[in-house]
Swiss-Prot record:
Function text: Catalyzes the transfer of the diacylglyceryl group from phosphatidylglycerol to the sulfhydryl group of the N-terminal cysteine of a prolipoprotein, the first step in the formation of mature lipoproteins.
Source organism per UniProt: Acidiphilium cryptum (strain JF-5)
Lineage: Bacteria, Pseudomonadati, Pseudomonadota, Alphaproteobacteria, Acetobacterales
One Pfam family hit: LGT
Protein name: Phosphatidylglycerol--prolipoprotein diacylglyceryl transferase
GO biological process, one term: lipoprotein biosynthetic process
Length: 276
């Protein structure tokens, strides 16, 4: 068969130290946090100045907690609540995968609100700066999914230029490499769009605009990418033939658009007051 490749059976563990091991999945999270921290230190000092470097350093631990707790709780509540009620001892096994981006996003949003309230920072502007580096983590996370041979795609038509057989799927049917498609849409493309937008001082000056772009952009990217991804076997297709990922992402498009509208409205109102 032309344009068909076999998933190369990567070892999900990068390095072993006796009883300890570093998984690619964990490495993706750590790398994303470090790169995001570095980028955010630069973003918060660009006009209008939002926070200090020290506050960004301090927030890193809050963001980590929000991602891990929110991501895990989101996966449990959105995807497998019944399973984890019967297997409470598996609740903490994050090294085996099972993290929800939507849950992680909510966890970080809560962390932003609490941290900004404690330190007198505008949460809208701070959230804008947090939003820009997030696609880095999405990109690396999807690459880790590919390395783990999980979240494979739906059967792909013969004309698709890069089909892949996943032995772990239990069949030799060529599929979409959905992890790589998601890495491209949710990660690479969204990051480029946000990075370019963040260079525009007019956009940066509208609190909530960049955050709205991220929320709406992710909603569009994830909803589109889910069309190539095989639904979770324990959920399948849900109402209207949509997947859980799509049901969680479609509202994000509306929420993100509303955030952008609000940002423009607030900016116009502040401009009118300044000239009054």
């Amino acid at each position: 068969m032309k344009n068909v490749y076999v998933w190369p059976h990567f070892d999900p563990i990068l390095v072993r130290f006796g009883p300890f091991a570093i998984h690619y999945y964990a490495l993706a999270y750590i790398t994303a946090l470090v790169l995001g921290w570095r980028l955010m230190r630069r973003l918060v000092r660009e006009a209008p100045v939002v926070a200090t470097h020290e506050q960004v350093d301090d927030f890193l631990s809050w963001a980590t907690l929000g991602v891990v707790l929110g991501g895990r709780l989101g996966y449990i509540l959105f995807y497998q609540p019944v399973y984890f009620l019967d297997h409470l001892n598996r609740t903490y096994a994050v090294w085996d995968g099972g993290m929800s981006f939507h849950g992680g996003m909510l966890g970080v949003a809560v962390a932003i609100l609490i941290y900004c309230r404690r330190h007198g920072i505008d949460p809208w502007r701070f959230g804008d700066r947090v939003a820009v580096p997030v696609p880095i983590g999405l990109f690396l996370g999807r690459i880790a999914n590919f390395v783990n041979g999980e979240l494979w795609g739906r059967p792909a038509p013969a004309w698709f230029p890069f089909r892949m057989i996943y032995p772990e799927s239990g069949s030799d049917v060529p599929r979409y490499p959905s992890e790589l498609i998601e890495a491209t849409l949710e990660g690479l493309v969204l990051f480029i769009v946000l990075l370019i937008a963040s260079r525009n001082e007019r956009i940066r000056s509208q609190p909530g605009y960049l955050g709205g772009m991220f929320v709406m952009g992710y909603g569009i990217a994830r909803t589109t990418a889910e069309c190539f991804r095989q639904p979770d076997w324990f959920l399948g297709y849900l109402m209207f033939g949509l997947t859980m990922g799509q049901l969680l992402s479609i509202p994000m498009i509306v929420i993100g658009a509303t955030m952008i509208w609000r940002a423009k409205y607030v900016a116009r109102r502040q401009g009118a007051l300044a000239t009054a």
